[in-house]
């Protein structure tokens, strides 16, 4: 479940971030991963220094301008969109290693009398991706409105990894007093629940004696005797909870006052907030 990264010009620093600046509806510092793909109306990449100069040093790695969808459709009539897809992932065959019988014939170590495919035991039969999206858009003679809701769930091919997302977005534009006052607002919120597996257990599984049992006779997990301190990889995946929660908020609010046609007074503010929480528990 490693986080993805995005680069425009390639790596320019060893220690500092190489990610471009993401500007969502005029708010700098957003994260493209926190938007539903269906909510994006347009995307522009500023690659040259001149175009990105307005953002100062923050735009040194390039700038991505994202405009999200606004309310649309015939005035007085709501437009409802529903998008759904589901995918299944299957693991390819594992690496070619000695079977239990081949291991016995090689006489490399103690024969415990079992035939255990440690690598296969770390894998699910399949994993899946589930994405659901619902939006409601509309317009009136004085403005527009829009709301969308998104749910994603994905599991990894290893026994203990998954990612679940809940997202919502709301946008509103309203003109009042014969167009003298105009209100604009938007709010994007997303919560992500993640469970991380341990890729290192696959390396452990490849080095395990395939004649060892998964369980002891009393039902407890068998533990190998190893000078390297290696433990039962299945137990490590099943009995260690390594999870995290992410909360993201991105909002804008704007008031425009047009008292004089040649002049326009405007007050705007924006909010960008993120909370990261990690929890590690060991149940043995």
Predicted features along the sequence, with ranges:
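Extracytoplasmic beta-strand/coil segments of soluble accessory domains associated
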Residues: 1-25, 41-42, 52-72
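Transmembrane beta-barrel architecture of outer-membrane proteins
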Residues: 3, 61, 129-133, 165-169, ...
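Short strand-turn segments of transmembrane beta-barrel domains in outer membranes
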Residues: 4, 20, 76-93, 109-135, ...
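Short beta-strands and strand-coil junctions in structured, solvent-facing domains, enriched
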Residues: 13-15, 29-31, 49-54, 71-75, ...
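Residues on the lipid-exposed face of transmembrane beta-strands in outer-membrane beta-barrel proteins
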Residues: 68, 82, 99, 134-138, ...
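Short loop/turn motifs that connect adjacent beta-strands in outer-membrane beta-barrel proteins
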Residues: 71-78, 141-142, 177-182, 260-268
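Membrane-embedded beta-strand positions of outer-membrane beta-barrel proteins
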Residues: 80-84, 147, 183-185, 253, ...
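Flexible loop and strand-edge segments within Gram-negative outer membrane beta-barrel domains
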Residues: 86, 91, 129-150, 154-161, ...
């Amino acid at each position: 479940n490693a986080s993805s990264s995005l680069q425009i010009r390639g790596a320019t620093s060893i220690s500092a971030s190489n990610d471009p600046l993401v500007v969502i509806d005029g708010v700098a510092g957003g994260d493209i991963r926190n938007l539903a793909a269906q909510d994006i109306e347009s995307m522009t990449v500023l690659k040259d220094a001149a175009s990105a100069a307005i953002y100062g040093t923050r735009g040194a790695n390039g700038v991505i301008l994202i405009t999200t969808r606004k309310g649309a459709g015939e005035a007085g009539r709501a437009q409802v969109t529903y998008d759904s897809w589901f995918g299944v992932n299957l693991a390819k065959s594992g690496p070619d290693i000695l079977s239990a019988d081949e291991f016995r014939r090689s006489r490399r170590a103690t024969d415990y009398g079992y035939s255990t495919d440690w690598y296969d035991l770390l894998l699910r039969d399949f994993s899946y991706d589930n994405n659901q999206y619902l939006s409601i858009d509309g317009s009136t003679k004085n403005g527009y409105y829009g709301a969308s809701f998104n749910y994603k769930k994905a599991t990894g091919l290893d026994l203990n990894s998954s990612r679940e997302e809940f997202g919502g977005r709301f946008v509103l534009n309203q003109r009042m007093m014969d167009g003298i006052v105009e209100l604009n607002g938007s709010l994007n919120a997303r919560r992500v629940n993640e469970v991380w597996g341990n890729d290192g257990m696959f390396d452990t599984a490849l080095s395990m004696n395939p004649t060892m049992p998964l369980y002891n006779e009393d039902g407890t997990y068998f533990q190998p005797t190893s000078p390297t301190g290696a433990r039962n990889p299945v137990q490590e995946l099943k009995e260690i909870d390594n999870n995290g929660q992410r909360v993201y908020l991105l909002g804008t609010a704007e008031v425009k006052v047009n008292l004089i046609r040649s002049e326009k007074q405007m007050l705007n503010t924006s909010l960008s907030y993120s909370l990261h929480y990690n929890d590690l528990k060991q149940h043995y």
